[in-house]
């Protein structure tokens, strides 16, 4: 009412009530029984980070993308014997056919010591036929390259005696009629192949 004086509202009791409620709330939420205290804190999410702009360069392969390989990454030694060399298959495919069977030659060597570093190396091949006794021959190489001319007749050889071979000498073998292995040695003389020895083994 106008003109009637009334005392102001007491604020102290309200502040006291509010303070008591806050204190009761805080006491009820002590660290010992709080669900907040028992809940692990959230870790920062990757989704809040800003994505990187797309790159035009391909990303490097992951280290865990492929299982480790048991194969070594070292390059193949060109001076090692390599009977699976593509050079052998190419040369054999270009040879004239076997004169007896008129068949091409099988590119898989029966024996040999072919390598790109030897002054003289050879492979023994057979005619690509199902005959019981196919024709065999040796094919010779100088520093990994086929020697097409100037080579003595190499038909009939069936193997190679690597224990008698050197960097410039090849020891080819063939079986004689009486069951003995014979060895014929050929050597690179600087300009061609020459026959240097003939021995009969047991």
Swiss-Prot record:
It is a lipid-anchor. The gene is lprE. A lipid is attached at residue 29 (S-diacylglycerol cysteine). The lineage of its organism: Bacteria, Bacillati, Actinomycetota, Actinomycetes, Mycobacteriales. Keywords: Cell membrane, Lipoprotein, Membrane, Palmitate, Signal. Residues 32-46 have a biased composition (Polar residues). Residues 62-75 have a biased composition (Low complexity). Residues 1-28 form the signal peptide. Its main location: membrane. This is Putative lipoprotein LprE.
């Amino acid at each position: 009412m106008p003109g009637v004086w009334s005392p102001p509202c007491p604020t102290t009791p309200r502040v006291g009530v509010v303070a008591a409620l806050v204190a009761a709330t805080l006491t009820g939420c002590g660290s010992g029984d709080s669900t907040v205290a028992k809940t692990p804190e959230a870790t920062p999410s990757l989704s809040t980070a800003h994505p990187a702009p797309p790159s035009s360069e391909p990303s490097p392969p992951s280290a865990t993308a492929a299982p480790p390989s048991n194969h070594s990454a070292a390059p193949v030694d060109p001076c090692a014997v390599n009977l699976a060399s593509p050079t052998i298959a190419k040369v054999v495919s270009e040879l004239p056919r076997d004169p007896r069977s008129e068949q091409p030659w099988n590119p898989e060597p029966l024996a040999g010591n072919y390598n790109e570093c030897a002054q003289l190396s050879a492979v023994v091949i057979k005619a690509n036929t199902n005959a019981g006794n196919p024709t065999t021959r040796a094919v010779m190489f100088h520093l990994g390259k086929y020697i097409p001319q100037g080579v003595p007749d190499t038909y009939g050889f069936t193997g190679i005696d690597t224990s008698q071979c050197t960097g410039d000498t090849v020891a080819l073998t063939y079986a004689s009629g009486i069951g003995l292995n014979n060895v014929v040695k050929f050597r690179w003389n600087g300009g061609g192949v020459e026959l240097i020895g003939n021995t009969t083994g047991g």
